[in-house]
Amino acid sequence: MGTVQAQAGGTEKAFIRNHTDAEVTWGPCPAFLPKGCELAVLHGDPAKKDADVLLKVPGGSVLAHHKHTSPERIVLLSGEMTVRYDGQQPVRLRPGTYAYGPAGLAHTATCFSKHSCVLFIAFIEPVDAIPVAH
């Protein structure tokens, strides 16, 4: 979709991306997540605070039980999935659904679509995914 010139006097430029854009560079997920899972950094440095990423999960895959040291703000962009946070009822996400996951709250998710599920995730703290025994 390209870059849009910022109106303010700063050096940072505004930009717009879609998960299908050629400018989006996908890389592998941590090894404990399903084969074919991919991550892409949209903005920021995932080793630092305030990074935005895309997560692509193959259809029919389960994200293993895990947690993050950061809260995560999620919007499902494509596909359908169920998220199960520990101690809470499972929630079904459809495209456009927003979900908030507190730091340290373990969860699992299932992409039950035929095609991949793609999520936008905003992290406050550095990006991580820590496996948790179920």
Task: Describe the function of each predicted region.
Residues V4-A51, H134:
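A short, N-terminal "cap"/entry segment at the start of jelly-roll beta-barrel domains
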Residues F32-K35, P46-K48, H68, V75, ...:
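Extracellular/periplasmic catalytic domains that process cell-envelope and extracellular macromolecules
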Residues L39-V41, D52-L54, R73, Y98-Y100, ...:
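Conserved hydrophobic/aromatic beta-strand scaffold that supports enzyme active sites
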Residues H43, K49-H68, P102-A106:
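Conserved short histidine dyad/triad with adjacent acidic residue
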Residues D45-A47, G87-G104:
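Short acidic-glycine-tyrosine-enriched beta hairpin
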Residues P58-S61, H68-G87:
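Glycine- and acidic-residue-biased ligand/ion/polar-headgroup-sensing regions
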Residues A103-V127:
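Ligand-binding loop in jelly-roll beta-barrel domains
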Residues V127-A133:
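Short, low-complexity, Pro/Ser/Thr/Gly-rich segments in the mature regions of secreted, periplasmic
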